[in-house]
């Protein structure tokens, strides 16, 4: 079963109003998809993270020539060569190969992996809380309320991009509006030191209904995380940009995190992503994969999560939630998968089990104009 054709789909969506996190505001969202087709006409889609012009050049210049003629079932021999060059490229190719193999076997993704343990997965609405507007706090709270009205009861909002006092005002106002009807996670995008992160205990202690405190510190600061975890009043989450399964080990061995957040697009392949999830289970941490970038990597995260044993016997079926981007982003509607009541049913059809919106794929195709990464 050889790869005959490789197509690229660089997609670009200009935002009506920039939004962002502690790293700054975004004016656009982008997505790079690939479609591999075998000689027998079996199709597999992949998603790659990165700057569109660079990804397109890499694929046209050497990835497509490298992939043409490769045997899908000999992935173990040649995918590591791609992983050595670029984890981002290899992640996308790995997804496409997985879909092709599942489709050939006549199985859904989860059945290819040995079967589903959870038929639906909870999702939390994820926000980019900042904007250039003076009334950004009110706008942020309105967005959370729109997700609440759509059935979400778990939300993640950003901190660390404004002063502590301003962020505190935002979060307290949000909790008051939610009236304890929803749980909130705070994501600082690695913007604090230990002392500043611990100032949040003041807010955590006088309100409840929290989920976790995400990446308060640079993720390399294992000692800082261990110290913070001993004193913080919320579970500490992190690891969305870690590049290998092994890079979770220092944090896990030191007991530095309560929750790990592997991201398939950073981990160079479907198998290393799934290994990271199981590694977390072996260490007894919770696992809530990071899935901000695109709908296909989110679908893989949902399916992989559905195959995990339960984290706890105490909370329903004990499976942790997955991130669901609830910001303005037309790329989110590219596949036919939407949450209902804060849950997403796992697709049962052959392969990835969802349909692509071909018209939207065409409409969102990047026109090649230059833009700042
Ligand atoms: Mg994060």
Language-model-detected regions and their locations in the chain:
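Hydrophobic faces of well-ordered beta-strands that scaffold small-molecule active sites
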Residues: 46, 123-126, 153-157, 184-188, ...
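C-terminal extensions of enzymes
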Residues: 327-373
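Metal-dependent enolase-superfamily TIM-barrel catalytic cores that perform enediolate-based chemistry
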Residues: 112-232
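Shared catalytic-loop signature of beta/alpha-barrel
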Residues: 65, 202, 208-209, 220-237, ...
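Metal- or metallocofactor-binding catalytic centers and their adjacent structured scaffolds
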Residues: 36-105
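Structured beta-strand/loop patches that form or line metal/cofactor-binding pockets in enzymes
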Residues: 1-45, 49, 325-332
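Conserved, mostly hydrophobic/aromatic
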Residues: 3, 34, 41, 93, ...
């Amino acid at each position: 079963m050889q790869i005959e054709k490789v197509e690229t789909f660089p997609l670009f969506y200009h935002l009506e109003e920039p939004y962002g996190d502690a790293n700054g505001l975004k004016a656009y969202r982008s997505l790079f998809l690939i479609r591999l087709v075998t000689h027998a006409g079996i199709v597999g889609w992949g998603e790659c993270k990165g700057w569109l012009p660079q990804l397109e050049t890499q694929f046209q210049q050497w990835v497509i020539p490298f992939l043409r003629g490769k045997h899908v079932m000999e992935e173990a021999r040649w995918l590591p060569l791609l992983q050595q060059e670029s984890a981002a490229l290899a992640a996308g190719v790995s997804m496409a190969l997985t879909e092709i193999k599942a489709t050939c076997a006549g199985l859904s993704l989860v059945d290819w992996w040995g079967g589903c343990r959870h038929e639906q997965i909870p999702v939390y609405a994820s926000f980019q809380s900042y904007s250039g507007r003076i009334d950004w706090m009110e706008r942020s709270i309105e967005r959370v309320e729109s997700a609440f009205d759509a059935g979400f009861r778990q939300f993640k909002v950003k901190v660390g991009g404004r002063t502590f006092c301003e962020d505190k005002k935002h979060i307290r106002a949000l909790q008051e509006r939610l009236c304890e009807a929803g749980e909130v996670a705070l994501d600082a995008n690695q913007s604090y030191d230990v002392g500043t992160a611990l100032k949040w205990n003041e807010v955590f202690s006088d309100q409840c209904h929290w989920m976790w405190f995400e990446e308060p510190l640079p993720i390399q600061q294992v000692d800082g995380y261990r110290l913070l975890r001993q004193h913080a009043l919320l579970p500490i989450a992190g690891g969305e940009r870690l590049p290998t399964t092994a890079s979770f080990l220092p944090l896990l061995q030191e007991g530095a995190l309560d929750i790990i957040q592997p991201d398939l697009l950073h981990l160079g392949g479907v198998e290393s992503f799934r290994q990271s999830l199981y590694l977390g289970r072996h260490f007894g941490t919770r696992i809530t994969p990071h899935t901000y970038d695109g709908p296909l990597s989110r679908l893989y995260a949902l399916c992989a999560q559905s195959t995990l044993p339960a984290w706890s016997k105490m909370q329903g079926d004990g499976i942790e939630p997955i991130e669901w981007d609830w910001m303005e982003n037309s790329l989110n509607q590219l596949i036919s998968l939407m949450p209902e009541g804060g849950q997403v049913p796992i697709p049962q059809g052959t392969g990835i089990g969802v349909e692509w919106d071909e018209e939207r794929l065409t409409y969102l195709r990047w026109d090649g104009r230059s833009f700042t990464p």
